[in-house]
Amino acid sequence: MEKPYKIIIPKITLAPYGVVQSSKAIKLPIPKNGETININKEVTIENNRDYGFNNENNSFKIKKIKRYDENIRVYLDFNKNNKAIKRRTLNIEIQGGLFGGSSEGCSMTFTQKNEDAILDIIDVTPKNINKRNIKIKFSDGEFVLYGPWEMEIK
Protein backbone atom coordinates (compact mmCIF):
# COMPACT_ATOMS: atom_id res chain seq x y z
CA MET A 1 0.00 0.00 0.00
CA GLU A 2 1.27 3.42 -0.95
CA LYS A 3 2.31 5.65 1.93
CA PRO A 4 0.51 8.97 2.21
CA TYR A 5 2.89 11.85 1.76
CA LYS A 6 2.69 15.59 1.66
CA ILE A 7 4.13 18.28 -0.52
CA ILE A 8 4.96 21.72 0.74
CA ILE A 9 3.96 24.67 -1.38
CA PRO A 10 6.92 27.03 -1.08
CA LYS A 11 6.89 30.40 0.58
CA ILE A 12 5.27 33.18 -1.41
CA THR A 13 7.09 36.46 -1.90
CA LEU A 14 6.51 39.60 -3.90
CA ALA A 15 9.71 40.98 -5.33
CA PRO A 16 9.52 44.31 -7.17
CA TYR A 17 12.90 45.53 -5.89
CA GLY A 18 13.94 42.63 -3.74
CA VAL A 19 12.45 39.78 -1.79
CA VAL A 20 9.73 40.61 0.71
CA GLN A 21 9.42 38.03 3.47
CA SER A 22 6.21 36.07 3.49
CA SER A 23 4.26 33.72 5.71
CA LYS A 24 5.28 30.14 6.46
CA ALA A 25 5.17 27.43 3.85
CA ILE A 26 1.82 25.70 3.40
CA LYS A 27 1.56 21.93 3.73
CA LEU A 28 -0.92 20.33 1.38
CA PRO A 29 -2.04 16.71 1.01
CA ILE A 30 -1.21 14.77 -2.12
CA PRO A 31 -4.23 13.05 -3.65
CA LYS A 32 -4.24 9.47 -4.88
CA ASN A 33 -4.01 8.99 -8.63
CA GLY A 34 -7.15 10.35 -10.30
CA GLU A 35 -8.35 11.96 -7.07
CA THR A 36 -9.18 15.65 -6.60
CA ILE A 37 -9.04 17.24 -3.16
CA ASN A 38 -10.95 20.49 -2.72
CA ILE A 39 -8.96 22.86 -0.53
CA ASN A 40 -10.44 26.37 -0.91
CA LYS A 41 -7.75 27.79 1.38
CA GLU A 42 -6.97 31.49 1.34
CA VAL A 43 -3.31 32.45 1.41
CA THR A 44 -2.35 35.95 2.48
CA ILE A 45 0.80 37.51 1.09
CA GLU A 46 2.57 39.56 3.73
CA ASN A 47 4.00 42.77 2.33
CA ASN A 48 6.35 45.40 3.63
CA ARG A 49 4.92 48.92 3.32
CA ASP A 50 8.41 50.20 2.48
CA TYR A 51 8.05 48.47 -0.88
CA GLY A 52 4.95 50.49 -1.74
CA PHE A 53 2.35 47.78 -1.13
CA ASN A 54 -0.87 48.27 0.77
CA ASN A 55 -2.49 45.48 2.76
CA GLU A 56 -5.61 45.20 0.61
CA ASN A 57 -6.32 42.25 -1.66
CA ASN A 58 -2.91 40.68 -1.20
CA SER A 59 -4.19 37.13 -1.13
CA PHE A 60 -5.18 34.24 -3.34
CA LYS A 61 -6.97 30.94 -2.88
CA ILE A 62 -5.71 27.43 -3.36
CA LYS A 63 -8.85 25.96 -4.90
CA LYS A 64 -8.09 22.28 -5.36
CA ILE A 65 -5.37 19.73 -5.93
CA LYS A 66 -5.61 17.04 -8.58
CA ARG A 67 -3.33 14.12 -9.26
CA TYR A 68 -2.93 12.46 -12.62
CA ASP A 69 -0.37 9.68 -12.82
CA GLU A 70 2.63 11.02 -10.91
CA ASN A 71 1.84 14.68 -11.53
CA ILE A 72 0.18 17.04 -9.10
CA ARG A 73 -1.86 20.01 -10.31
CA VAL A 74 -2.70 22.81 -7.90
CA TYR A 75 -5.42 25.24 -8.97
CA LEU A 76 -4.93 28.79 -7.73
CA ASP A 77 -7.58 31.49 -7.78
CA PHE A 78 -6.31 35.07 -7.87
CA ASN A 79 -8.63 37.88 -6.85
CA LYS A 80 -9.43 40.07 -9.88
CA ASN A 81 -8.96 43.11 -7.65
CA ASN A 82 -5.61 41.90 -6.43
CA LYS A 83 -3.56 44.96 -7.30
CA ALA A 84 -0.29 43.54 -6.05
CA ILE A 85 -0.64 40.40 -8.17
CA LYS A 86 -1.72 42.32 -11.26
CA ARG A 87 1.01 44.94 -11.09
CA ARG A 88 3.90 42.94 -9.80
CA THR A 89 5.81 39.83 -10.51
CA LEU A 90 5.04 37.05 -8.07
CA ASN A 91 8.11 35.13 -7.01
CA ILE A 92 7.81 31.55 -5.82
CA GLU A 93 10.89 30.71 -3.83
CA ILE A 94 11.92 27.25 -2.75
CA GLN A 95 13.16 27.68 0.81
CA GLY A 96 15.08 25.68 3.37
CA GLY A 97 13.88 22.21 4.24
CA LEU A 98 12.81 21.41 0.71
CA PHE A 99 16.07 21.73 -1.16
CA GLY A 100 18.89 21.24 1.29
CA GLY A 101 18.32 24.52 3.11
CA SER A 102 19.30 26.67 0.17
CA SER A 103 17.07 28.56 -2.21
CA GLU A 104 19.84 29.36 -4.68
CA GLY A 105 18.78 28.45 -8.20
CA CYS A 106 15.43 27.30 -6.90
CA SER A 107 13.06 30.13 -7.64
CA MET A 108 10.87 31.14 -10.53
CA THR A 109 9.04 34.30 -11.43
CA PHE A 110 5.95 34.93 -13.48
CA THR A 111 3.56 37.79 -14.07
CA GLN A 112 -0.07 36.94 -13.35
CA LYS A 113 -2.08 37.52 -16.53
CA ASN A 114 -5.53 36.39 -15.49
CA GLU A 115 -7.56 35.37 -12.48
CA ASP A 116 -6.72 31.68 -12.48
CA ALA A 117 -3.33 30.05 -12.50
CA ILE A 118 -2.24 26.44 -12.45
CA LEU A 119 0.79 25.13 -10.62
CA ASP A 120 1.97 21.78 -11.97
CA ILE A 121 4.36 19.80 -9.81
CA ILE A 122 5.66 17.05 -12.02
CA ASP A 123 6.66 13.53 -11.02
CA VAL A 124 6.55 13.69 -7.22
CA THR A 125 6.80 9.99 -6.47
CA PRO A 126 8.85 8.73 -3.52
CA LYS A 127 11.28 7.10 -5.96
CA ASN A 128 12.23 10.57 -7.23
CA ILE A 129 12.67 12.27 -3.88
CA ASN A 130 16.45 12.41 -4.06
CA LYS A 131 16.70 12.89 -7.81
CA ARG A 132 17.58 16.17 -9.45
CA ASN A 133 15.78 18.26 -12.05
CA ILE A 134 12.23 17.97 -10.71
CA LYS A 135 10.02 20.22 -12.83
CA ILE A 136 7.43 22.71 -11.69
CA LYS A 137 5.17 24.43 -14.19
CA PHE A 138 3.39 27.63 -13.29
CA SER A 139 0.79 29.00 -15.70
CA ASP A 140 2.53 29.65 -18.99
CA GLY A 141 6.07 29.09 -17.75
CA GLU A 142 8.18 26.15 -16.67
CA PHE A 143 11.08 26.13 -14.27
CA VAL A 144 13.35 23.18 -13.64
CA LEU A 145 14.30 22.85 -9.98
CA TYR A 146 17.67 21.41 -9.13
CA GLY A 147 17.34 19.02 -6.21
CA PRO A 148 17.70 17.16 -4.12
CA TRP A 149 13.93 16.94 -3.82
CA GLU A 150 13.26 16.65 -0.10
CA MET A 151 9.59 15.87 0.08
CA GLU A 152 8.18 15.23 3.51
CA ILE A 153 6.85 11.68 3.80
CA LYS A 154 4.49 10.71 6.62
Enumerate the language-model features and the residues they cover:
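Alpha-helical, hydrophobic structural elements that either
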Residues: 1-154
